[in-house]
A protein has these predicted regions:
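N-terminal catalytic or cofactor-binding beta/alpha core of small enzyme domains
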Residues: 2-107
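Acidic/His-rich segments in extracytoplasmic proteins that coordinate ligands and/or metal ions
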Residues: 110
């Protein structure tokens, strides 16, 4: 079985996800893409790509997609209004915490 991680209940996490499960974390920044595009371009692409991968591969592999992380390291765009950026250490700490939370549920492939 495959699907969206956040659609499972707590008890389902223990029964549906196994050590063979692959958990995908899409990451898309909130940053400028010029005056003609919204700040969410990277987020939308990452979210839709993850859903497409799930649709295409979810019957062949045990794949679970986490909610898309909408913040990343975007300090190169800090000059632009609206950009939200995490420091490298902060982003790595967030990714580590997410991985530990997921792998704590006996899932190893993130």
């Amino acid at each position: 079985m495959s699907g969206m991680y956040q659609d499972l209940t707590g008890p389902e996490i223990l029964t549906e996800l196994t050590e063979e499960s692959i958990v995908l974390l899409p990451i898309g920044a909130i940053e400028q893409h010029g005056p003609h595009l919204p700040l969410s371009v990277d987020y939308v692409i990452a979210d839709e790509m993850a859903r497409a991968v799930l649709e295409k591969c979810g019957k062949e592999i045990d794949l679970w997609v986490l909610p898309t992380l909408s913040f990343s390291k975007s300090n190169e765009h800090s000059w632009s209004p609206g950009t939200i950026s995490l420091e490298y250490k902060t982003l790595m700490a967030v990714l580590n915490d997410i991985a530990l939370s997921v792998s704590n549920k006996k899932k190893k492939k993130i």
